């Protein structure tokens, strides 16, 4: 059993490493926040699918990675912004645009986990979890 101090960074690192190794799927310990991150990645077209699985009594989230016809993933970079030691909060007017709108930022807001674009539209700010492009 691994005890990590930053489960979101662990999840993002597992996805990043699996993409670099050209794996078709990757498993990570499940949580509500990681499930929401996977949901957003699927909605935005960065992963093929995800599902909750249970192996040996442990709840996992299985992420199915997506590759184009040239075997290149839509995810080229994943950056963790807010960390346990240095939280980053922004208002609705300060939500970062990633690569001029080509990438996404993912935030936790009072209205749930959403992309920076959705948060701007709804006029809410929150904690910037990561940027993906």
Curated annotation (Swiss-Prot):
Keyword Flavoprotein present in the record's keywords: the answer is: no
Q: Which Pfam families match?
A: Ribosomal_S8
Q: What GO biological process, any one, is recorded here?
A: translation
Q: In the record, what terms sit under GO molecular function?
A: rRNA binding; structural constituent of ribosome
Assigned keywords, A-Z = Ribonucleoprotein, Ribosomal protein, RNA-binding, rRNA-binding
Q: Does the keyword Ribosomal protein apply?
A: yes
Q: Name one GO cellular component term.
A: ribosome
Q: Show the SUPFAM superfamilies listed in the entry.
A: Ribosomal protein S8
Q: What family is this protein classified in?
A: Belongs to the universal ribosomal protein uS8 family.
Q: Which HAMAP family match?
A: Ribosomal_uS8_B (MF_01302_B)
PANTHER family per the UniProt record, alphabetical: 40S RIBOSOMAL PROTEIN S15A
- Fill in the subunit field for this protein: Part of the 30S ribosomal subunit. Contacts proteins S5 and S12.
Role played: One of the primary rRNA binding proteins, it binds directly to 16S rRNA central domain where it helps coordinate assembly of the platform of the 30S subunit.
Q: What is this protein called?
A: Small ribosomal subunit protein uS8
């Amino acid at each position: 059993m691994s005890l990590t101090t930053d489960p979101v960074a662990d999840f993002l690192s597992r996805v990043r490493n699996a993409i670099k190794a050209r794996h078709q799927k990757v498993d990570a310990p499940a949580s509500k926040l990681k499930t929401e991150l996977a949901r957003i990645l699927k909605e935005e077209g960065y992963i093929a699918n995800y599902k909750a699985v249970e192996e040996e009594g442990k709840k996992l989230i299985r992420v199915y990675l997506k590759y184009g016809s040239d075997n290149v993933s839509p995810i080229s970079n994943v950056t963790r912004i807010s960390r346990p030691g240095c939280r980053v909060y922004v208002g609705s007017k300060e939500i970062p645009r990633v690569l001029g709108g080509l990438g996404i930022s993912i935030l936790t807001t009072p209205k749930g986990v959403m992309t920076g674009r959705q948060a701007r539209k709804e006029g809410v700010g929150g904690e910037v979890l990561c940027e993906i492009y």
